[in-house]
């Protein structure tokens, strides 16, 4: 089935994407159909949002081989060579019962689904793939993987990013999520990155064991593994919260135990954000509402709901 927003010049389905529908049906998933594959799109999230307004069903997926206006959190550009990676959006309809407060929790659940699918694809027995609050999947390197205790900051490379956008009905206390657009950018086949990305990004192909044939890395299999994780966890978390997945999320938390630098209004430990653009502390995990727990140098434990959290000027972002 073609999307009504499809570009007329869309190319035939790439070989490693031909099995998506069959795998979705084989596993009995509620997500993945219909699947709309575009040779090029501005943004798959924009396609999904437009289709959602026109009544597209729950579980619909839009995938692009190339994006001209792909974006991540806070408007950052997501760059990807044509046909090498997974750039897709999933439309979720929570059924009118999901409060807005659940959105941060669902962003983490999506990150966990991407992390789990990536770990399966590369055979991540060492547990190097982690979820970095609030919406990235990263691969730990070197001493970070070994759990160095000499005070050195951990080192990681970004593998994937998640962007959630919502369509709301009602207002105030009655506001509910009518449609949730889950956008994912996951590096799969890319082996070299331009500019500064060369030292900050990675891909499934680069993370696999040396000598593993690249052709065995199927984007269809990885995509369906992500969809299966969402199928398993999203409905439960949307209704009841993070309790079911919290232990898994804690085990995969990239920031837990690390010294962090927090920026932004809701990360500020005073009532006057302009007076403290940044502050430092130690991350103690993620709570059941999806907020980052950071104990400041003043000893106070704070719950960070938004803003930027880094490892500091010498660490990975």
What is each stretch, according to the model?
Residues 44, 88, 114, 136, ...:
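Residue-level signal for inorganic ion chemistry
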Residues 141, 163-170:
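Short, low-complexity Ser/Thr-rich regulatory SLiMs
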Residues 209-279, 315-317:
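Conserved, helical-rich catalytic subdomain that frames metal- and/or nucleotide-binding sites
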């Amino acid at each position: 089935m073609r999307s009504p927003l499809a570009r007329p010049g869309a190319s035939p389905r790439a070989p490693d994407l031909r099995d998506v529908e069959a795998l979705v049906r084989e596993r009995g998933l509620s997500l993945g159909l219909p699947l709309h594959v575009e040779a090029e799109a501005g943004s798959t999230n924009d396609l999904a949002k437009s289709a959602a307004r026109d009544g597209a069903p729950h579980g619909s997926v839009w995938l692009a081989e190339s994006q001209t206006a792909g974006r991540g959190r806070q408007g950052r550009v997501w760059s990807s060579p044509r046909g090498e990676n997974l750039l897709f959006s999933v439309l979720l309809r929570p059924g009118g019962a999901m409060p807005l407060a659940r959105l941060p929790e669902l962003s983490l659940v999506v990150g966990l689904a991407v992390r789990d699918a990536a770990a399966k694809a590369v055979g991540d027995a060492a547990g190097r793939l982690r979820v970095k609050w609030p919406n990235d999947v990263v691969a730990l390197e070197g001493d970070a993987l070994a759990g160095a205790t000499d005070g050195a900051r951990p080192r990681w490379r970004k593998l994937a990013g998640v962007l959630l956008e919502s369509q709301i009905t009602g207002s105030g206390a009655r506001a509910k999520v009518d449609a949730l657009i889950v956008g994912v950018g996951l590096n799969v086949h890319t082996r070299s990155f331009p500019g500064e990305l060369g030292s900050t990004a990675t891909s499934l192909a680069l993370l696999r064991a040396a000598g593993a044939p690249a052709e065995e890395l199927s984007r269809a299999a990885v995509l369906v593994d992500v969809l299966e994780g969402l199928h398993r966890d999203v409905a439960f978390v949307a209704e009841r919260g993070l309790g079911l997945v919290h232990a898994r999320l804690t085990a995969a938390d990239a920031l837990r135990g690390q010294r962090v630098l927090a920026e932004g209004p809701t990360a500020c430990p005073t009532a006057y954000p302009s007076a403290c653009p940044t502050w430092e502390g130690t991350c103690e995990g993620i709570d059941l509402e999806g907020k980052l727990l950071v104990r400041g140098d003043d000893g106070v434990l704070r719950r960070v709901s938004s803003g930027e959290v880094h490892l500091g000027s010498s660490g990975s972002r």
